[in-house]
Each structure stands twice: as C-alpha cells, then as structure tokens.
Amino acid sequence: MNSFLMHWTYAIPEIWVLTMACVVLLADLFWGDGLRDLAAVLTVLTLSGAAVLTVFEMGQSGTAFAGLFVLDRFTNVAELFSYLAVLMVVLYSRRYLVDRGIYRGEVFVLLLFALLGIMVMVSGGSLLSVYLGLELLALSQYALVAFYRDSVMATEAGLKYFVLGALASGLLLYGMSLLYGLTGTLDVRDIAADLVNMTAGNLVLVFAIVFIAAGIAFKLGAAPFHMWLPDVYQGAPTVVTAFLASAPKIGAFALIIRLLVDGGYGMQESWQQIFVALTVVSLVVGNVIAIAQQNIKRMLAYSTIGHVGFMLLGIVAGTEAGLASAFFYTVVYTLMSLAGFGMILLVSRAGFEAERIDDFKGLAQRKPWYAFLMMIVMFSMAGVPPTVGFYAKLAVFQAVVAAGYVWLAVVGVLLAVIGAFYYLRVVKVMYFDKPAPDAGLIVRDDLASMALSINSLALLVLGILPGPLMAFCFYAMRGVI
C-alpha cells in the first residue's frame, strides 16, 4: 500500500497539471464568455501550484509505475524551467490574442496539455512513456499553430508541421521498435545494460540509433531536419511561436537524455558521430541563411537552428560537464527566445504584425526602453559579454575542447562571429535608422512590458552573475552518466 501511494506521490505535479487542464477547459466552457480572463488566471495558478509541488519533490529520486516514471534531479529542474517558459508565454499573450479575437480558453488548455507532454517526456523511464509524452506535446502544438483560423499562413503552417511532424514521429517510433526487438524491453535502463554487450557493428542497432537520432533532430530543429522550422515560426501566431521556441526545446533535450544518455550510453561512440555531423550542419545552415532573412521571425527561426548546433556541442562532448553545459545553454536559449518573441508581441498591434526587421526601425526614438531591452536580447543571442549568452557559449566550448574536439570548437567560434552580424543588424536598425512613416504607435501593455523587462534584464543579470544558474544546471545533470 505504501509503495502504491509513493508511486502516485512521485507523479503529483503531472496529475495536478492534467486535472487543472480539464478544470480550465470546463471553466471556460461554462463561464468563459462572461469572465474572459478566467482561463489565463487559472493557468497561472496551475503553473504556480505545479512549481510548488515540484519544489517539495526536490532531492527525492526513484521510479514508479513499473519503471514508466523516473523521478530524479533532472526531472525536477527541467520541469521548473518548463513552468517558467509557459508562464512567460501566458503573460505576453493577452493583448495579442484579444486584438486578433482569439483570446479563448482553448489556447491555455492546449498550452497546459503541451506542458504535460513535456513533463511526461522529462520523467519518462520507458520508451512507451517517452513516446506518449512526445505525442501529447506534438498534437497540442499542431493545434496551437493552426489555431488562428482566419490566418491562411497559420493554417498552412499547421498542415506543414503536422505532415512533417508525423513523419518524424514515425522515424522515432521505428527506431524505438528496433531497440525493443533487439533487447526485449521498453525500460531505458535495461536497454542500456543490454546494449553494453552488443557490438557497434550490429546493423539493426545502427539503424535504430540513426532513426532515433533523426527523430530527435527533427524535434530539436537541427539541420538537415529543419525544413519545418522557418515556415512554422513565420506562419504561426507569434504567441505560439514564442512557445514553440522555448519550453519544447527543454522537452527535446530530455529526449536526448532519456533515450541516448540513459538508454544508449553503451553506444555513445555511434550516436556521438551522428551528432557531430548534425552540429556542424546546424551551425552552418542556421548562421549563414539567417543573414539573408528580412522577416525577423524567420531570422530567429534560422538562428534557432544555429543555437541548436551550439547546444549539441555539449552533447557531443559526452561528459557530465558537457551535458550540464548543454542543459545550461538550452535554458539560456529558452530565456532569450522568450524575450525576443515577447518584443515582437509588444511592437505588434491590432491589424499589424511586427514581423519585418524594418518594422523595428527607429525603435530607440519611439520606445527607448524597448530598444534597450531588445539590444540586450540581441547581444545575448550573439554571445556578447557581459550577457548570459556569452557564458552559455563559453561553457559548451570548454566542454567540447576538454573532450578533444578542438576543431569543432573552432568551427563554433567562427560561426558565432558570422552569426553576430544579423543580430547586430537589428540593433543598428533600432538605433541608427529613422522610423518608417507607417510605423504607428506602440500600444501600451503594462503586464507584458513588465514581464519583458524582467525577462530581458535577467539575461544581463545572469551574465554578470552566471554562477547560480550554471550550478543549478550542473546539479540537475549530476549522476546522469
């Protein structure tokens, strides 16, 4: 009986989020028309409650439900950062959704179900639970991307995402099925133990690793599996894009940890070489093609591909320090992307999407504070000290050099310098170009403005004092290998 209760105790945050997602849906159904903010308020309460429950679990470890669920340091820390990302999206979203007539409870319900999918992925101890979490996240994302039915671009982006996402899920599932056929178990720890005794030349095992790596690369947005990313980021409502660029990246990182580190560490040399190729291609494609973009959402999409390349440097290192630096980079990228897309949301207004880089011309004259915040974001993405983006890049470079991949670090540094161009171009447009004649007024939004200020200034504060966040990420990854 005590063991049974302990199993449910481990999963209390997930149960809380699932229950509250249903409550938000029902509350919006019965009272949503009269109380327009009800769903958003309940969502914030859900995230706050989940954070409290997760904090109470800190320090505990174990498995539950016959190995389907794993509670460890990484589970707790990754879930906390996921709550933060979804909270920021909710705070940024209100005026944008109201202006477009889509401020409805379904948006927040889908966000909560997507969050639940991330939580299940992060805590998955079995191929089955990891895949179920992945599909829950993916289905919620497809619906969110196509939610704005009046937008042809959103509908088109949703269809593209669905078709390519289904293909990637199929690849991942096929790789998992091959692993199951080889080992006869779904438990990732048992799979890892069985793989130690297998030869690297086993053809079925090679195919399994390739298919799983391809599926993970798609979910991350790593090149050459990035085809969906620019179109979906550009076509989706900016609120949804802000979500896609943040919390799901933590979930994708969890896929690597659970499937390749926990489940395939015995075959590290095999999947490491695949990720070396993914890293180089992502760095080149993301940073070079972003230079040619005039649409800022599309530019940030290609920059995401580049950032994924930097994050994969830590994965390639394959050490505990490398994985911790990769997790640190993922968290920092999440904060940077939230601030970047949050600024696009603030500059947009009813009937106008601030999607072109030219829409930010003269922002320093129109809204000096917003321009300053956006400058911090761009500097952090470029890796300019003293922003936290610099320390994130430095951490992965140190890890990959320590692992013996000096040439890979050199490639990363060169492409970081190239990538700085398109970030600094946005700063130049804001400070040195005159506002366009049709620029219009920026509508005041106190809640989103306060959230953006905290988000952007955090990039500067964490750059001056990176130690606590870095230590927290290292704490999460301790003992993973």
Curated annotation (Swiss-Prot):
Catalytic activity as recorded in UniProt: a quinone + NADH + 5 H(+)(in) = a quinol + NAD(+) + 4 H(+)(out)
Keyword Transmembrane helix attributed: yes
Keywords of this entry: Cell inner membrane, Cell membrane, Membrane, NAD, Quinone, Translocase, Transmembrane, Transmembrane helix, Transport, Ubiquinone
Parts of the chain that traverse the membrane: 11-31, 38-58, 69-89, 107-127, 128-148, 162-182, 203-223, 237-257, 271-291, 299-319, 327-347, 370-390, 401-421, 457-477
Family matches, as Pfam families: Proton_antipo_M
Top enzyme category: translocase
Keyword Membrane attributed: yes
Membrane disposition: Multi-pass membrane protein
Entry superkingdom: Bacteria
GO terms of biological process kind: ATP synthesis coupled electron transport
Recorded GO CC terms: plasma membrane
Subcellular location as annotated: Cell inner membrane
Main subcellular location: membrane
EC number assigned by the record: 7.1.1.-
Molecular function (Gene Ontology), one example: NADH:ubiquinone reductase (non-electrogenic) activity
Function: NDH-1 shuttles electrons from NADH, via FMN and iron-sulfur (Fe-S) centers, to quinones in the respiratory chain. The immediate electron acceptor for the enzyme in this species is believed to be ubiquinone. Couples the redox reaction to proton translocation (for every two electrons transferred, four hydrogen ions are translocated across the cytoplasmic membrane), and thus conserves the redox energy in a proton gradient.
PANTHER family for this protein: NADH DEHYDROGENASE
Family: Belongs to the complex I subunit 2 family.
Assembly information from the UniProt record: NDH-1 is composed of 14 different subunits. Subunits NuoA, H, J, K, L, M, N constitute the membrane sector of the complex.
Name of this chain's protein: NADH-quinone oxidoreductase subunit N
Organism ancestry: Bacteria, Pseudomonadati, Pseudomonadota, Acidithiobacillia, Acidithiobacillales
GN (gene name): nuoN
